[in-house]
Design a protein with these regions (language model features):
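Short loop/edge segments at beta-strand edges and connector loops
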Residues: 5, 99-101, 176, 200
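Class I S-adenosylmethionine-dependent transferase superfamily signal
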Residues: 35, 61, 136, 158-162
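Conserved Class I SAM-dependent methyltransferase catalytic core
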Residues: 149-213
Length: 217
């Protein structure tokens, strides 16, 4: 239905949607709430929404944490167009920008530093995609679904490469798939994140893993 009407609501924001992006899920509001609660306590935080898709997560953060400045990072040309449309639609052009970024590669030096990275990356194991419900498998972009053989490719890459744009005390917040929370927590711990938490979605499924960068490696 979202693709037919070309829009969807997320965290109270009406957003443009196309077949270049995933339809925003209520599960992702768990990640938005966790990030917003922390960011409201920071002074003028700089936030990166990596694998931004429609931009729903970063735009929700910008709308609810008025001091935040947000970069929407997305590789897909089609998704990047939707991000830019939604920045304008939400009236957030002063504090939100969109950039073409590849989460699987090290960040560009010109990006600068961030106080928080939020990411809802592709996390479906490649072999599970043929078995997805047809409404997802046949219409939503596989680029936004496929997380590699075990679904963890993007978590590994972000933990390995993107911690370099954070400083001690910065926060990393992930949405994760069913059964992935413990593995992602271990990945984060292995690269210097502490105060790690796993948060459930409204159905009680472990859905968010977050932590603060403690040390340089």
């Amino acid at each position: 239905m979202a693709y037919l009407i070309g829009e969807w609501e997320f965290y109270g924001l009406p957003l443009d949607i196309s077949e270049s992006v995933l339809i925003p899920r209520p599960d992702t509001e768990t990640l938005a709430e966790a990030a917003i609660g922390w960011l409201r306590q920071q002074e003028a935080p700089r936030v990166l929404d990596l694998c931004a898709g429609s931009g729903c997560l970063g735009l929700a953060i910008a709308s609810q944490a008025p001091g935040a400045r947000v970069v929407l990072g997305e590789l897909s040309d089609g998704a990047l167009r939707i991000c830019r449309q939604n920045i304008r639609r939400c009236g957030l052009t002063g504090r939100v920008t969109a950039m073409q970024l590849d989460a699987l590669r090290p960040p560009l030096q010109r990006l600068g530093g961030f106080d928080c990275i939020v990411s809802n990356p592709p996390y479906i194991p490649s072999g599970d995609i043929p078995g997805l419900d047809a409404s997802v498998r046949d219409y939503e972009p596989h680029m936004a679904l496929d997380g590699g053989a075990d679904g963890l490719d993007f978590y590994r890459a972000i933990c390995a490469h993107w911690r370099s744009v954070l400083h001690p005390g910065s926060r990393l917040c992930f949405e994760v798939g069913i059964g992935q929370a413990d593995d992602v927590l271990r990945l984060m711990r292995s690269v210097g994140f502490g105060d790690l938490e796993i948060l459930p979605d409204p159905a009680g499924i472990p859905r968010v893993v977050l932590g603060d960068l403690y040390q340089e490696i």
